[in-house]
């Protein structure tokens, strides 16, 4: 079977100091046609002002345009405050200035969301993300505040029908149910809520209506094949490629989604399912 349809990586980062355009070239040469480029902050010095967030986002948008112009790939862009950047700023500023530091961190988070919304309204960005909560143990205060701000962001997204890409903790029995409850409480359409770095059990009974974006390492294939027919709305595939010169190929390399797509087809997953993954679902979630 020769599949010549679209192939989309739903969560990939690019870095001007990394492979950048060469990574996009590798993706295309393997058969990739579309990318969802997710903003990645400079964790060593994340923005501290609204203007700083806008400038950082503008650079991600510029990289997306370079990829479009150079290779003709479809590129959708996701902008927002990475939970790790928020948590590290929060902890540093609270240590420096107590309650004032807390307020400053919350204000900066809101500025980052406002800046992302600006580019969504301008038609340059397609979703907000990756937003959510830390994937490592933190103090209860940090966890509770992260959830509070996540729900605030869900509320804003619900008002305008904007998709969210979520960065959350590793799998636990309550992860999907908790996210679903919070989103529904804020009026979100769960079909606009994407769980980045999702495990490969994509049954709707497991995902509670969220859209899973499966990190498609080799170990994910068997479970994905077992469960994909029970994914009511479908699923995405992603690499979470970091384009980090210090960690080449992490998390998965840019050639991975095209390779996994063909492996899934060879294993008996239908072309219709892959067409939904790579074309119909992205159009429904992000728009054309």
Q: Language-model features: where?
A:
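Active-site gating loops and adjacent loop-to-helix segments of metal-dependent hydrolytic enzymes
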Residues: 31, 37-51, 87-102, 124, ...
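Mid-to-C-terminal alpha-helical segments outside catalytic/metal-binding sites
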Residues: 6, 155, 258-288
């Amino acid at each position: 079977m020769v599949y010549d349809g679209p192939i989309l990586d739903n969560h990939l980062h690019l870095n001007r100091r990394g492979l950048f355009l060469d990574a996009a070239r590798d993706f295309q040469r393997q058969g990739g046609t579309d990318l969802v480029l997710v903003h990645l902050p400079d964790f060593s010095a994340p923005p501290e002002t609204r203007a700083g967030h806008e400038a950082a986002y503008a650079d991600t948008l510029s990289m997306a345009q370079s990829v479009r112009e150079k290779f003709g790939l479809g590129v959708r862009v996701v902008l927002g405050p990475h939970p790790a950047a928020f948590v590290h700023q929060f902890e540093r500023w609270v240590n420096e200035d107590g309650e004032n530091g807390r307020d400053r961190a919350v204000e900066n988070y809101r500025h980052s969301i406002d800046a992302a919304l600006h580019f969504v309204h301008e038609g340059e960005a397609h979703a907000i993300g990756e937003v959510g909560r830390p994937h490592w143990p933190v103090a209860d205060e940090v966890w509770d505040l992260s959830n509070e701000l996540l729900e605030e962001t869900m509320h804003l997204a619900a008002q305008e029908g904007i998709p969210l890409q979520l960065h959350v903790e590793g799998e636990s029995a309550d992860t999907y149910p908790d996210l679903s409850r919070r989103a529904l409480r804020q009026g979100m359409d769960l079909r606009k809520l994407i769980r980045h770095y999702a495990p490969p059990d994509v049954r709707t009974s497991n995902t509670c209506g969220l859209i899973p974006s499966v990190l498609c390492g080799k170990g994910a294939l068997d479970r994905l094949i077992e469960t994909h027919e029970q994914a009511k709305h479908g699923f995405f595939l992603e690499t979470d490629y970091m384009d980090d010169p210090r960690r080449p190929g992490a998390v998965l390399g840019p050639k991975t989604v095209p390779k996994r797509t063909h492996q899934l087809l060879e294993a008996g997953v239908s072309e219709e399912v892959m067409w939904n993954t790579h074309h119909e679902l992205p159009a429904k979630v992000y728009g054309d």
